[in-house]
């Protein structure tokens, strides 16, 4: 039971450092270092003296870029010339609208939940500080993450919008309001620790880089200890995941973060041999038969 609870904690961290760096020089003569990541496969972080570059790989289209961000340090913004191409985000950010409960939880652990000014899908957010903010009116209800209240988001004028993208996703009017959209695609990583490592990106955004690095190191150590313990366990509990939505039952692919988590936890999962990194759209009858 203790093992399962601890594994759930690690999962929530991202339902919720390598010191190796490669030095380059940009067009403005700044020294830039590529941060070596231990597990994450779909993100690159390049740190320069006055800005950082974060490149998100498209997990659905191999070899293509999903989004490129240029994080400009506010104190240096007036003196920077020749910025590279990409979505400009001034950091540390001072306010945000967050579409997913998992990111609300992570920002709370990073100590920056006070910078959340609006949320979507409030019924799924169980954090006391978020619920109190909604009651007091300091945090706005922006509706559903599928159909957000765009006008309310615009009225809040946040520095960024954090949401989870989908393949060929279009954000409609939200793309036209001039607010940087942070595409949080960490759920498409192929390991739980790869997914968790994206907190380093969010640490850069919110000005809590050291705290994010420290938290990730704790998660990394804890997860691997639990994995070793789980592999030695003699029992292999079976798991049934998710739930029926209409006529479809979505289950994690065997190569997804959840699928890999089940393997690491030594849990018997019906689709563990599947090779997909996303979710599987299955009939309820098929899932029950498995």
Walk through the language-model features, giving the residues of each.
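Ligand-binding pocket segment of bilobal, Venus flytrap-like solute-binding proteins
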Residues: 55, 63, 280-290
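Bacterial Sec-dependent N-terminal signal peptides
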Residues: 1-26
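Extracytoplasmic substrate-binding proteins
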Residues: 138, 149, 155-249, 272-273, ...
């Amino acid at each position: 039971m203790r093992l399962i609870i601890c594994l759930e904690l690690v999962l929530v961290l991202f339902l919720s450092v390598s010191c190796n760096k490669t030095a380059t020089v940009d067009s403005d003569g700044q020294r830039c270092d590529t941060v070596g990541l231990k597990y994450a496969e779909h993100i690159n972080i390049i740190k320069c003296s006055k800005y950082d570059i974060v490149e998100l790989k498209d997990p659905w289209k191999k070899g293509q870029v999903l989004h490129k961000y240029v994080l400009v340090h506010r104190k240096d913004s007036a003196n920077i010339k020749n910025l590279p191409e990409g979505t400009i985000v001034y950091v540390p950010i001072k306010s945000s609208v967050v579409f997913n409960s998992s990111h609300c939880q992570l920002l709370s652990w990073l100590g920056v939940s006070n910078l959340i000014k609006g949320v979507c899908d409030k019924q799924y957010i169980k954090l006391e500080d978020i619920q109190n903010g909604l009651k007091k009116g300091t945090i706005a209800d922006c509706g559903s993450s599928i159909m957000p209240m765009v006008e309310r988001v615009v009225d809040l004028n946040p520095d960024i919008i954090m949401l989870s993208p989908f393949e060929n996703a279009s954000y409609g009017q939200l793309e036209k309001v001039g607010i940087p959209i942070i595409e949080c695609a960490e759920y498409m990583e192929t390991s739980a620790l790869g997914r968790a490592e994206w907190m380093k990106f969010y640490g850069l955004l919110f000005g809590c880089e050291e705290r994010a690095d420290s938290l990730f190191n704790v998660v990394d150590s804890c997860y691997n200890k639990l994995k070793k313990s789980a592999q030695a366990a003699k029992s292999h509990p079976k798991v049934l995941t998710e739930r029926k939505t209409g006529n479809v039952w979505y289950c994690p692919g065997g190569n997804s973060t959840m699928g890999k988590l089940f393997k690491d936890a030594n849990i018997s999962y019906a689709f563990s041999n599947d090779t997909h990194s996303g979710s599987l759209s299955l009939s309820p009858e098929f899932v029950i038969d498995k």
